[in-house]
């Protein structure tokens, strides 16, 4: 199982935004510089986050982005869904007639990977942006 850079960067950028948006709106340029993420890539990500009402943009010379919700109400699953990130541990589609291995059956370890996927998704559903902020404060020196 692997998350794409889109999902990882969305989470990183939102943690960065949450750290600073209580002062003023945060520019994507500032997030880009602090996190080492391409500005063009951030613009694509934030377009999706805005469309899904996780962030809102503020126009003007002091403009930028702010969270649209309390960090405690933004779960990692919300972020992943907003940027079209899906956590998958199996390659097959549940509704596929071909099964996992191109046959009409599931692979021998299918249920193991299905259960793992369920645990991972539950973990992400229970982790909020606020949790990551708290964890970040504890680990920073």
Describe each model-derived feature in a short phrase.
Residues 10-22:
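Short amphipathic alpha-helical interface segments
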Residues 26-36:
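A short alpha-helical element within helix-turn-helix/winged-helix DNA-binding domains
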Residues 40:
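Key DNA-contact positions within bacterial/archaeal DNA-binding proteins
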Residues 45-50:
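Basic amphipathic alpha-helical segments that dock to polyanions
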Residues 51-54, 82:
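Residue cluster at the C-terminal edge of the helix-turn-helix DNA-binding motif
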Residues 54-62, 66-67:
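Beta-hairpin "wing" of winged helix-turn-helix
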Residues 76, 92-141:
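C-terminal regulatory/oligomerization modules of transcriptional regulators
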